[in-house]
């Protein structure tokens, strides 16, 4: 026996929960499925929010370092990384808790589970679809939340029926070709979990994530090298914004190597990371070493051909929009 919903949403990140809240506001019966322990997706748990918490801390450090320019005598005596970690987790917990409460208030049923389905793209728009649930990898039962923070074990399998399904499964960090994340070669999630700011860091990428960590670590006193493929950061964005940020990062001490293409990375336990690269217009291969190397070259969609929907060559769900 399956439970009927007007809308089933797979993924409780910003795309999923925003859709759920609006659909519930319009009177739909909504189910929101999330495999992780908390709602909010990458942004709230492993991205935008925790990174801003750390940026707040490093901005404070930078302000103190520049206080003498204003005639204020101040100094940074050290960083208590345990307290900083607690602050970051507290900020995340507060926002995730607020979101969970809002979802419950709107009458949205949240399932902690993995979802599987097979859509028929030729079926009429009014057809029902079956979404099969199984427990998340670290759980023995599916957990159902009718109230925030009150899980109800619901057995090892469950089927939901819905007229409409929204896929909002998000994305994962994209590794360098031929260089999987390992050793000191890390992704943005791992970068948020470091126990101390690195003495030196190489960042590969020129987008928002790369620039957040470049500015954060630089403000904390790290020696930061930024490897970018174009002549400025944010090359796909507004030219003035990219040019201004490139200039300001350099002014603050970030070493930006432009027109660089990474060939490979050497890393190992306690060895740091040596990033090898070539530069447009220059002969031979060059290298730069960092205690850690952060790869921030984009994200790949989390999709599955077994869903029965058309997946393009880049892993995206094909749409008619």
Segment roles from a protein language model:
Residues 2-5, 22-28, 34-197, 230-234, ...:
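Glycine-rich flavin
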Residues 11, 167-169, 188, 204, ...:
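Short, well-ordered coil/turn residues at beta-beta hairpins
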Residues 6-32, 210-218:
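N-terminal Rossmann-like FAD-binding beta1-loop-alpha1 element of flavoenzymes
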Residues 183-197, 292-321:
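FAD-site-proximal beta/loop scaffold in flavoenzymes
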């Amino acid at each position: 026996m399956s439970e009927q919903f007007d809308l089933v949403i797979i993924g409780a990140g910003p795309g999923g929960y925003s859709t759920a809240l609006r659909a519930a506001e319009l009177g739909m019966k909504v189910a929101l499925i999330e495999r992780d322990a908390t709602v909010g997706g990458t942004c709230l748990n492993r991205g935008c929010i925790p990174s801003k918490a750390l940026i707040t801390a490093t901005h404070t450090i930078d302000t103190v370092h520049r206080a003498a320019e204003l005639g204020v005598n101040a100094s940074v005596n050290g960083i208590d990384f345990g307290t900083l970690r607690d602050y970051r987790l507290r900020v995340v917990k507060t926002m995730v808790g607020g979101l969970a409460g809002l979802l419950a208030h709107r009458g949205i049923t949240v399932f902690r589970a993995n979802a599987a389905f097979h859509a028929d793209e030729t079926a009429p728009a009014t057809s029902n679809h079956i979404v099969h649930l199984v427990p998340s990898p670290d759980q023995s039962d599916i957990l159902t939340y009718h109230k925030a923070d009150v899980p109800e074990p619901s057995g090892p399998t469950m089927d939901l029926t819905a007229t409409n399904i929204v896929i909002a499964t998000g994305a994962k960090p994209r590794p360098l070709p031929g260089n999987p994340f390992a050793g000191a070669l890390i992704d943005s999630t791992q970068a948020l979990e470091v126990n101390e700011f690195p003495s030196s860091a190489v960042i590969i990428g020129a987008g928002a994530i790369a620039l957040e960590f470049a500015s954060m670590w630089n403000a904390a006193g790290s020696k930061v090298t930024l490897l970018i493929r174009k002549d400025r950061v944010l090359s796909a964005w507004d030219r003035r914004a990219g040019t201004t940020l490139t200039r300001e990062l350099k002014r603050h001490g970030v070493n930006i190597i432009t027109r660089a293409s990474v060939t490979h990375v050497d890393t190992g336990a306690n060895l740091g990371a040596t990033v090898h690269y070539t530069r447009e217009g220059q002969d031979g291969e060059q290298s730069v070493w960092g205690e850690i190397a952060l790869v921030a070259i984009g994200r790949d969609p989390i999709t599955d051909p077994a869903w029965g929907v058309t997946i393009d060559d880049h892993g995206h769900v094909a749409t008619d929009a």
